[in-house]
C-alpha cells in the first residue's frame, strides 16, 4: 500500500502519496514490477498533481515514460523531479544536459516543469513547492471562450479540412 503523508504548507494541506519506485530490468521480478506500476497508476488516479521522481544516477527508464504518459492521459498536472542531484559533480552543465535529455524523452509532456534536487541533502528542495503551486494554478485556470475560439480558428486556418471534389 502506498505511504501517505499530509503536509501543511502556507496554510494549504497537501497529501503526498509515495509509491514504490520503479527499477531497471533485472533488479526485480517482472510481476512485482507490473504490480508496482498498477499501484502508481492508482495513485495517479487519486491525485491532482504527479511528481515523477527520476533517479539521476539511474537516468530515465521506460517505466518513467509510462507513468508520465498515464498522468498526461489522465489529465493530471505533472512535475518531473530529478533526485540525487547531490551525486553530480558538474551541476551547471548537468542541469542543461539532463533537461535536454528529459525534453527529448518526454516530448509528449513539454509543459511539465523539471526540478533538480537532493532529498538526502535537501539541496534545491525549496524549488519544488513554487512549481507545485504554479502547476496547481494552471490546472484550475479558466480560458475565455473567445480566446479559445480564436485559437481554434487559427489552427483551422493553418490546417483547413480537405475539400471533397473541390467543394
Explain the meaning of each model-derived region.
Residues 1-17, 21, 27-38, 42, ...:
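C-terminal-of-GTPase-core extension/linker across diverse P-loop GTPases
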Amino acid at each position: 500500500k502506498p505511504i501517505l503523508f499530509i503536509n501543511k504548507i502556507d496554510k494549504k494541506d497537501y497529501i503526498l502519496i509515495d509509491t514504490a519506485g520503479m527499477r531497471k530490468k533485472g533488479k526485480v521480478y517482472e510481476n512485482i514490477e507490473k504490480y508496482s506500476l498498477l499501484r502508481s497508476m492508482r495513485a495517479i488516479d487519486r491525485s491532482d498533481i504527479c511528481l515523477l521522481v527520476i533517479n539521476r544516477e539511474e537516468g530515465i527508464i521506460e517505466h518513467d515514460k509510462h507513468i508520465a504518459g498515464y498522468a498526461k492521459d489522465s489529465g493530471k498536472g505533472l512535475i518531473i523531479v530529478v533526485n540525487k542531484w547531490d551525486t553530480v559533480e558538474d551541476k551547471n552543465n548537468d542541469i542543461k544536459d539532463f533537461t535536454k535529455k528529459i525534453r527529448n524523452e518526454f516530448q509528449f509532456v513539454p509543459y511539465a516543469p523539471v526540478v533538480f534536487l537532493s532529498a538526502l541533502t535537501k539541496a534545491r528542495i525549496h524549488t519544488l513547492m513554487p512549481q507545485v503551486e504554479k502547476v496547481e494554478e494552471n490546472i484550475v485556470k479558466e480560458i475565455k471562450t473567445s480566446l479559445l475560439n480564436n485559437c481554434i480558428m487559427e489552427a483551422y486556418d493553418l490546417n483547413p479540412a480537405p475539400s471533397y471534389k473541390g467543394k
